[in-house]
């Protein structure tokens, strides 16, 4: 019987080379492990587009930059992710043809799916909470209209929950918008009413 194969760890430089060799694929990198990002549902794609558009519209001419899921962020020296959306207000992250990763994200957004929800809620939440530039982490549900924002408050993180009819505020970038704008054009239902 053959011995089980040991997991192969790769360096950040090897991961970058893998990304250059496969420009149509996105690979997240966590501490020597590489994870291929898969596509999501149409609702996931639409919500991702809506959140980027909403952030762009509400930020207006502010000196912040909104990015979609094609932009990776450097969470630490050994962790790089592709969130569904992110915002940076750091001049180092001004969009240029040379810049390949966001260095100082302030807001990170993940649209939840069945296959990634556990990773987004636990592993990535821990990574994002450890990144000193990230002030807010927004998770958007696809099973029902529900959003949570995890907000840095000194050394702690506070949880803010939003549902239909609510206005979401992202304090770190000074914007407010209706939860409904995130679900525009989708068939994602409202959460069940617990009062019935």
Locations of regions flagged by a protein language model:
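Gly/Pro/Ser/Thr-rich low-complexity, intrinsically disordered segments predominantly at protein N-termini
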Residues: 1-196
